[in-house]
Every structure is written in C-alpha cells, then in structure tokens.
Amino acid sequence: MITLTESAKSAVTRFISSTGKPIAGLRIRVEGGGCSGLKYSLKLEEAGAEDDQLVDCDGITLLIDSASAPLLDGVTMDFVESMEGSGFTFVNPNATNSCGCGKSFAC
C-alpha cells in the first residue's frame, strides 16, 4: 500500500516521541485542495476510526481511511531536510498531474 523511507520513519518516530502522549498512529489522508485538486494531510491520532485500514511500517502504524486508500496505493513517503526547509514528500504513481510546488496532485 504505502512505503515510508528510513528518513520518513525516523521523522515520524521523533514526532510521536515529542508528543508525550499515547499515539495510535499517523493518519495519512487525501483531501480536496491545492492547485491540482488533491493534497495530502498528516496528523498524529490518539485513536483510529472504525473504517480505518491499519498499515504497519516497521512498528509505525498508519491510519488510512477507506476513501484515501486507493489514492495512496503504491505511494512512497519521504522526509527531506534542506536549507530551504524540511518536510514530507510523496511519490505517487497514481497521480496524473502535480503542481509545481509538489504539494498537490490530480488523479
């Protein structure tokens, strides 16, 4: 379904540890927005929803809702750090178009 690079796993683990709270997992969602129509949303959740698909990535639980699941199939998530900033990036084989900033896509 979705692959996290070592850099992404390390970043997610750091973020979970910094909350000081029990975290059920990282919610990855596709929602409307951005200049190409769809964008990724990430949020640490204390509990999952009934219809979530739970994906284990080396001990990190990903919470994926049923509407987002087909759009995330085959996605690779990375965490990059540069002089311009840091953040998560996504390579999505399902995307037919993406905007210049890399923050949104179309299927």
Swiss-Prot record:
InterPro entries: FeS_biogenesis, FeS_cluster_insertion, FeS_cluster_insertion_CS, HesB-like_dom_sf. Transmembrane segments: none annotated. GO terms for molecular function: 2 iron, 2 sulfur cluster binding; 4 iron, 4 sulfur cluster binding; iron ion binding. It holds the Pfam family Fe-S_biosyn. GO terms for biological process: iron-sulfur cluster assembly. Belongs to the HesB/IscA family. This is Uncharacterized protein in nifU 5'region.
